[in-house]
């Protein structure tokens, strides 16, 4: 590893930004989609290009159940917005995404404070295997912060018994030229997919969230992508 590869990219800072790329894949099978991914974004050159511009981590999930059949989710954390913009303005990167997805959405999110986030340890021998998402427009970020904090207070103990690892809430970063529109995404990481879905079926705590929603929430559940997808 060269010294140049250890230098922070232009515009990098301590703050991290969440990139969620969700889309329908063109391939008929997950295995075929994995091959396309690993030869484009997941190729050694693709990985190095992303990391050199501030892509700190990249994980791949597939839809769990009929609701997200045929969909793939990337969860990436970046620490350089200029680097992220430069990466996704590269025609080769866009061409690779077009090979993989028939349709996709790739919003960027910034960290929030005061939303009841928590991050717990993972017991030995366990790992994150599942993700639960809730994405929704809210009446205001201040009101949403109070509501999500109340949600966490009411649910953290029960959710941990079902295997939750972390719960974080992020606010939408507007696209260049767009007006800010309060929207958040909640990201739950879990150790067991079955226990995760069982917990969500209980419907705990949502009475605290409903009053601040300014639209219908989009909820989805995901599992770690099977097979050897390139991740870092």
PLM ranges: what are they?
Residues 1-232:
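Short S/T/G/P-rich N-terminal loop/turn motif that feeds into the first structured element of a domain
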């Amino acid at each position: 590893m060269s010294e140049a590869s250890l230098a922070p990219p232009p515009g990098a800072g301590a703050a991290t930004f969440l990139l969620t790329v969700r889309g329908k894949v063109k391939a008929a099978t997950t295995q075929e989609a994995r091959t396309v991914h690993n030869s484009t974004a997941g190729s050694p050159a693709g990985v190095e290009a992303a990391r050199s511009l501030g892509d700190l981590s990249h994980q791949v999930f597939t839809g769990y159940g009929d609701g997200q059949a045929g969909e793939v989710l990337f969860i990436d954390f970046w620490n350089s917005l200029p680097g992220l913009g430069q990466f996704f303005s590269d025609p080769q990167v866009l061409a690779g995404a077009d090979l993989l997805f028939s349709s996709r959405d790739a919003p960027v999110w910034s960290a929030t404070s005061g939303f009841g986030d928590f991050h717990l340890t993972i017991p030995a021998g366990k790992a994150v295997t599942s993700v639960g998402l809730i994405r929704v427009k809210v009446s205001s970020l201040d009101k949403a912060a109070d509501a999500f904090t109340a949600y966490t207070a009411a649910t953290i103990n029960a959710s941990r018994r079902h295997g939750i690892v972390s719960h974080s809430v992020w606010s939408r970063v507007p696209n260049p030229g767009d007006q800010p529109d309060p929207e958040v995404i909640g990201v739950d990481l879990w150790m067991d997919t079955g226990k995760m879905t069982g917990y969500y079926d209980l419907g705990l705590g949502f009475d605290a969230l409903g009053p601040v929603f300014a639209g219908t929430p989009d909820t989805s559940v995901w599992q770690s992508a099977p097979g050897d997808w390139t991740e870092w």
